[in-house]
């Protein structure tokens, strides 16, 4: 399908283009302030029209995978692609007086083959013009691109866009949309971390995962002095189409996105992921299997946090498992969930390249009723930090059938801390290691006779201090094995309590062990719930080996 022909044909209101008076007035009044890069025909645009467009598109066959790019772009190396820079003199709102925000576009090339169309919208008249690709919008530097192959190819489109905010206009971006339906944002550290997506399809099924694309964006012209703007997007894939509205607030210490989507199923969908996010966890306090580097921890996120519909708060530390793991946490109208990076201490990472201590958390706050479903978490084995291996999303309980229409409203918070947190005691850290011996005797001259795994969970905040004289009770539930040597320790350096126990196997099974714990005082819960998944070693590995060489 020719997307340019479709988008123009789907907008019945495009008849306004025939009015030369309106067109002349609009081009002079609205687009002159935007560096004149919007050069397409004038068409009327609004969100209702975009929804109609997406609904009509769902009744047509999918247009298929992206077509080929000119060889000079298709064969770019990552280094060459990164050297292509958008010319800031041609930024979308370059001519807006007292602008606090600006937009630049990404070049197509390398793995970014989908030709994404961009439109500028005047918010007063609701008229839009397309921004066509041309080489003069970019600086190719030493990328080695043969620009003669690009001349006259206005249908190349763009790969995505990024947003800049004063006082760092044209220097450091705060929002990025690039590739399929992926997008990211930063907090006040300007350090990117995990990503979000518009939609996830069949992430964990017996079929192949499907990655929908944002194929077009419409930008409402930002007002002078404003740090909020609105962008609309058309989503398209083999199984579904969608109309999206993003109201993006670029605040001083965080980026907040109000997202509204309307989805139209082309065919039955086995697994639909709403508000999906993708992150990386290689190693941390609780999992050091592949941490043979100079860095104590390597991760974009350290936990999945959930505020369930019944009010329960959940902390689920992330893992880097040896086998792919998928867990679905059932819920009804969740209040919120997210992948968080709460450990912000540089000394815990010692990384001057990745700066993992500066990476943002991402919290999802549903704004309408989502009904029954599950917060789904997939963890994939990884040996390093260059591949994302954590996926999280909301999966509706109801099966999605061809012709179904769905709508989800939610808010995304990109910030150091989530906007809400449990008033009860919270999990600060999870640690695991050798068990079966008294603390302070690790392991001494004699290794323990019986193999065990030790877990230490640190809690802070809430009413822990007030509860301590009355008695704090750890309530531990295990899917297999036994918890022994349970200890409650006050730890002055972080002014909290450490709950420590040893897990002993009761069978030879290597199936994951689901662990659950919360703190109780006089029958009342005084902490959020800690969830964990532990992977026991094979029976022949459940022994301690003294590998000392005595001379």
Curated annotation (Swiss-Prot):
Record's keyword terms, sorted: Periplasm, Signal
Gene Ontology molecular function, alphabetical: carbohydrate binding; catalytic activity
SUPFAM superfamilies recorded: E set domains (SSF81296), Galactose mutarotase-like (SSF74650)
Pathway: Glycan metabolism; osmoregulated periplasmic glucan (OPG) biosynthesis
Pfam families the record matches: MdoG
Keyword Signal assigned: yes
Family as reported in the entry's similarity comment: Belongs to the OpgD/OpgG family.
Gene Ontology BP terms: beta-glucan biosynthetic process
Protein purpose: Probably involved in the control of the structural glucose backbone of osmoregulated periplasmic glucans (OPGs).
Organism: Salmonella typhimurium (strain LT2 / SGSC1412 / ATCC 700720)
Main location: periplasm
Signal peptide range in chain numbering: 1-32
Subcellular location as annotated: Periplasm
GO cellular component labels: outer membrane-bounded periplasmic space
Modification note: Predicted to be exported by the Tat system. The position of the signal peptide cleavage has not been experimentally proven.
Top-level lineage group: Bacteria
Name assigned to this protein: Glucans biosynthesis protein D
NCBIfam families the record matches: TAT_signal_seq
């Amino acid at each position: 399908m020719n997307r340019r022909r479709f988008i123009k044909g789907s907008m019945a209101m495009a008849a306004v283009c025939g009015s030369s008076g309106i067109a002349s007035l609009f081009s002079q009044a609205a687009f002159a302030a935007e560096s004149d890069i919007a050069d397409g025909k004038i068409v009327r645009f609004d969100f209702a029209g975009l929804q109609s467009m997406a609904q009509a598109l769902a009744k047509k066959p999918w247009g298929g995978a992206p077509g080929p790019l000119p060889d000079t772009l298709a064969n770019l190396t990552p280094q060459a692609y990164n050297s292509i820079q958008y010319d800031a003199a041609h930024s979308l709102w370059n001519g807006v007086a007292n602008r606090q925000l600006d937009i630049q576009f990404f070049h197509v090339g390398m793995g970014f083959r989908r030709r994404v169309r961009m439109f500028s919208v005047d918010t007063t008249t609701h008229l839009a013009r397309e921004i066509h690709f041309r080489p003069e919008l970019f600086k190719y530097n030493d990328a080695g691109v043969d620009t003669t192959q690009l001349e006259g190819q206005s249908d190349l489109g763009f790969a995505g866009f990024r947003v800049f905010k004063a006082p760092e206009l044209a220097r450091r971006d705060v929002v990025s949309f690039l590739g399929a339906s992926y997008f990211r944002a930063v907090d006040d550290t300007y350090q990117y971390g995990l990503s979000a997506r518009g939609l996830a399809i069949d992430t964990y099924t017996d079929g192949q995962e499907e990655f929908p694309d944002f194929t077009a964006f419409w930008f409402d012209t930002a007002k002078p002095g404003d740090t909020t703007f609105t962008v609309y997007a058309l989503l398209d894939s083999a199984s579904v189409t969608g109309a999206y509205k993003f109201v993006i607030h670029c605040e001083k210490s965080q980026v907040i996105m109000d997202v509204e989507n309307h989805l139209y199923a082309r065919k039955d969908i086995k697994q639909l992921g709403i508000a999906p996010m993708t992150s990386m966890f290689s190693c941390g306090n609780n999992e050091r299997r592949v941490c043979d580097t100079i860095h104590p921890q390597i991760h974009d996120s350290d936990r999945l946090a959930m505020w369930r519909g019944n009010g329960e708060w959940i902390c689920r530390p992330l893992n880097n498992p040896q086998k792919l793991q998928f867990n679905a946490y059932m819920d009804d109208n969740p209040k919120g969930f997210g992948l968080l990076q709460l450990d912000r201490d540089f000394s815990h990472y010692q990384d001057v390249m990745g700066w993992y201590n500066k990476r943002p958390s991402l919290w999802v706050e549903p704004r309408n009723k989502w009904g029954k479903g599950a917060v789904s978490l997939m963890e994939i084995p990884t040996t390093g930090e260059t591949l994302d291996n954590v996926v999280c999303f909301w999966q509706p309980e109801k099966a999605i059938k061809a012709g179904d229409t769905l709508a989800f409203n939610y808010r995304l918070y990109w910030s150091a801390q989530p906007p809400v947190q449990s008033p009860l005691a919270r999990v600060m850290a999870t640690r695991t290691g050798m068990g079966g011996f008294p603390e302070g005797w690790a392991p001494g001259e004699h290794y323990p006779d019986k193999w065990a795994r030790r877990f230490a969970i640190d809690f802070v905040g809430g009413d822990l201090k007030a509860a301590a004289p009355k008695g704090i009770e750890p309530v531990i539930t295990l899917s297999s094995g036994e918890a022994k040597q349970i200890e409650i320790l006050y730890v002055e350096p972080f002014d909290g309590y450490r709950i420590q126990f040893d897990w002993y196997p009761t069978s030879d099974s290597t199936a994951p062990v689901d662990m659950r714990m919360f703190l109780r005082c006089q029958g009342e819960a005084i902490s959020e719930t800690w969830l964990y998944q532990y992977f026991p070693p094979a029976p022949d590995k459940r022994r301690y080996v003294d590998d000392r060489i005595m001379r």
